[in-house]
């Protein structure tokens, strides 16, 4: 059973870990620590945006293929859909990715999408800009401290637009008021909802 958490990586990574641990699910995480482009990207988004997005798209497609061949329940903290519907268009709209690169990227994604099935459940964790900034400061990653507010705002707006048109099974969690880590009642409420929707 494939499950996907979507939303800002600052809001969903810990949630993915907790859900996987609680139910013995297999967790697939966004490849951040060994990403050869990430630090360069945050220092010069225009120069490295296409390289980074292709890197993520490649990793994500490999994950999709692997997950589709597994009989286990797998939860993933970033989806191939977000790359093409959120991040690449946001970079293009902000002038951080050229039209040539964006069209090339989109063509590649459309080909991959023709081979991809929707997950059994998509879980969108909605976080406000102030909440995202809190997460960034708590994580303390140097390269994230230079993130522009307009960049975060653009991502949030695109998430909302995409979620409105998403055709698969969807669950929305308020990331501002739901505390997975420190409030067991919040965690139980969300997990009960997930289990009722996926019928494990």
What are these regions (language model features)?
Residues 60-98:
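A basic- and aromatic-enriched beta-loop-alpha substructure that forms the phosphate/nucleotide-
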Residues 85-158:
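A glycine- and Lys/Arg-enriched "phosphate-lid" helix/loop adjacent to the NTP-binding pocket
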Residues 1-7, 12, 199:
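Single conserved hydrophobic/aromatic residue that forms the stacking wall/gate
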Residues 15:
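Hydrophobic positions on the alpha1 helix immediately C-terminal to the Walker A/P-loop
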Residues 32-35, 80-82, 127-132, 177-180:
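Conserved nucleotide-binding/hydrolysis micro-motifs of P-loop NTPases
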Residues 28, 76, 121-123, 171-173:
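Hydrophobic/aromatic beta-strand patches that form the interior of the parallel beta-sheet core
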Residues 21-59:
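Conserved substrate/cofactor phosphate-moiety recognition/catalytic segment
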Residues 133-198:
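NTP-dependent small-molecule kinase module
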């Amino acid at each position: 059973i494939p499950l996907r958490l979507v939303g800002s990586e600052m809001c969903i990574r810990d949630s993915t870990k907790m859900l996987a641990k609680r139910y013995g699910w297999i967790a697939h995480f966004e490849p951040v620590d060994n990403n050869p482009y990430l630090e360069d990207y945050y220092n010069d988004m225009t120069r490295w945006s296409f390289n980074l997005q292709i890197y993520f798209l490649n990793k994500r497609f490999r994950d999709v293929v692997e997950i589709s061949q597994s009989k286990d329940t797998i939860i993933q903290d970033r989806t191939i859909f977000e790359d093409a519907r959120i991040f690449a268009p946001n970079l293009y709209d902000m002038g951080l990715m050229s039209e040539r690169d964006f069209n090339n990227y989109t063509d590649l994604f459309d080909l991959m999408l023709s081979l991809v099935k929707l997950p059994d459940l998509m879980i969108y964790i909605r976080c406000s800009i102030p909440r995202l900034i809190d997460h960034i400061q708590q994580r303390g990653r140097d390269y994230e401290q230079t993130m522009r507010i307009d960049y975060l705002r653009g991502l949030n707006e695109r998430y909302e637009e995409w979620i409105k048109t998403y055709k698969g099974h969807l669950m929305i969690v308020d990331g501002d008021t739901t505390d997975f880590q420190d409030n067991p009642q919040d965690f139980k409420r969300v997990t009960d909802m997930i289990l009722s929707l996926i019928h494990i």
